[in-house]
Regions:
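C-terminal alpha-helix plus adjacent terminal tail
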Residues: 66-69, 84-227
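Conserved catalytic cores of soluble enzyme domains
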Residues: 1-123
Length: 227
């Protein structure tokens, strides 16, 4: 999977279930489904579940966008290269044999540089660690802000909890708790399918789509409206 640009939702799922996942400096990775009353599906509980637990919760609940270097750090990518090298890599892959793929990727990979997310790891660990429910996580984030943490990142987390669908966040939080039992992507995606059938029958899905994609007022009225 060549992830040179926006890699979100279903696109992220297609990439994460590939044998080789290539990121660039142009990569923007996220699972933003909680903004439309759904939950991170396409097996996200499996691939995000391989990240440290606080990070998996953070990415799944808030839909935060991360860069390619952060994906490398978290094990969400197998290689990093400059965006301008993508066309060269494509040409080589089209002509190569299967057993040559690793060597070809190694020949063009570059240092991803400093992961933007690394700077925020202490805050993520503080808010999203332990046995905390989404409600407790929200309170932790708000407390940091109230204590004078003049950090734009903390503000983003607080805003995400306030704006995104409470039921969606709770569903994914619970889904992560059972992710360890999944042996394959098929198992994770099968459960996602059945959960999605239930979620799209709820008013939150219609409201989320209306708010973000139709009217674009970004003022959804969730049911329930709090965690």
């Amino acid at each position: 999977a060549l992830c040179d640009g926006v890699v979100m939702g279903a696109g992220a799922g297609l990439a994460q279930h590939s044998s080789h996942i290539i990121m660039t400096e142009a990569t923007k990775f996220a699972m933003p489904e909680s903004s439309i009353g759904l939950f991170p599906d396409v097996g996200a509980s499996l691939f995000l579940g391989r990240c440290p637990v606080p990070v998996a919760r953070f990415l799944g609940l808030t839909g935060h966008i991360i860069d390619g270097a952060s994906c490398i750090m978290l094990g969400l990518a197998t290689a990093f290269l400059a965006s301008q090298q993508i066309d060269e890599l494509k040409e080589k892959l089209v002509r190569c044999k299967t057993d040559e793929i690793e060597k070809i990727i190694a020949s063009v990979r570059t240092d991803p540089g400093f992961p933007a997310l690394k700077h925020h790891m202490p805050v993520i660990s503080h808010i999203f660690s332990g046995q905390a429910t989404p409600e407790v996580m929200q309170k932790r984030a708000q407390k940091l802000l109230n204590l004078g943490a003049n950090d734009p990142f903390v503000r983003q987390v607080v805003s995400a909890f306030a704006e995104r669908c409470p039921m969606s966040m709770t569903v994914f939080w619970r889904l992560l708790k059972v992710a360890d039992h999944f042996a394959t992507a098929d198992e994770a995606i099968s459960l996602d399918f059945h959960l999605t059938l239930r979620m799209i029958r709820r008013p939150d899905f219609i409201e989320g789509v209306r708010s973000l994609l139709v009217d674009k007022d970004k003022a959804p009225k969730w049911v329930p409206d709090r965690l």
